[in-house]
Amino acid sequence: MVKVKIEFSGGLELLFGNQKQHDVDVPVQEGKQLTAGHLIAWTRDNMLRERPELFVKGHTVRPGILVLINECDWELSGATESTISDGDVVVFISTLHGG
């Protein structure tokens, strides 16, 4: 298990029970590392309450959602292949707003 703090903002929290912060234990296979892609799939399957099309597209987040791992843009560390470790903070921020 990997202990991760997940935060949602920019309206994404509405898809996750209207709760912005979650402390979760994510299972990983023996000898494997948790990746951001695996975390997204686990979050979709275990935490998402409604409208998955607003959070995921294929095996990643929808365009317009920023992902920060320990305050760093995940694009700098490999996006879905970024490694997530015990105690990491992963933030999902929607930049899309209706109008």
Curated annotation (Swiss-Prot):
* Pfam families assigned: Urm1 (PF09138)
Pathway as given in its UniProt record: tRNA modification; 5-methoxycarbonylmethyl-2-thiouridine-tRNA biosynthesis
Keyword annotations for this protein? Cytoplasm, Isopeptide bond, tRNA processing, Ubl conjugation pathway
An example GO BP is: tRNA wobble uridine modification
1-thioglycine sites (modified residues):
G99
**One GO CC term, this protein:** cytosol
**TM regions (residue ranges):** none
Reproduce the UniProt comment on modification after translation. C-terminal thiocarboxylation occurs in 2 steps, it is first acyl-adenylated (-COAMP) via the hesA/moeB/thiF part of the MOCS3 homolog, then thiocarboxylated (-COSH) via the rhodanese domain of the MOCS3 homolog.
- Write down the superkingdom of origin: Eukaryota
Q: Where in the cell is it found?
A: Cytoplasm
Q: Where is this cross-link: Glycyl lysine isopeptide (Gly-Lys) (interchain with K-? in acceptor proteins)?
A: G99
Please report which protein family the annotation says this sequence is part of: Belongs to the URM1 family.
Q: Which HAMAP family match?
A: Urm1
Q: Could you tell me which PANTHER family the record lists for this protein?
A: RURM1 PROTEIN
What this chain does, per the entry, is described as: Acts as a sulfur carrier required for 2-thiolation of mcm(5)S(2)U at tRNA wobble positions of cytosolic tRNA(Lys), tRNA(Glu) and tRNA(Gln). Serves as sulfur donor in tRNA 2-thiolation reaction by being thiocarboxylated (-COSH) at its C-terminus by MOCS3. The sulfur is then transferred to tRNA to form 2-thiolation of mcm(5)S(2)U. Also acts as a ubiquitin-like protein (UBL) that is covalently conjugated via an isopeptide bond to lysine residues of target proteins.
Q: What is this protein called?
A: Ubiquitin-related modifier 1 homolog
What gene does the UniProt entry assign to this protein? URM1
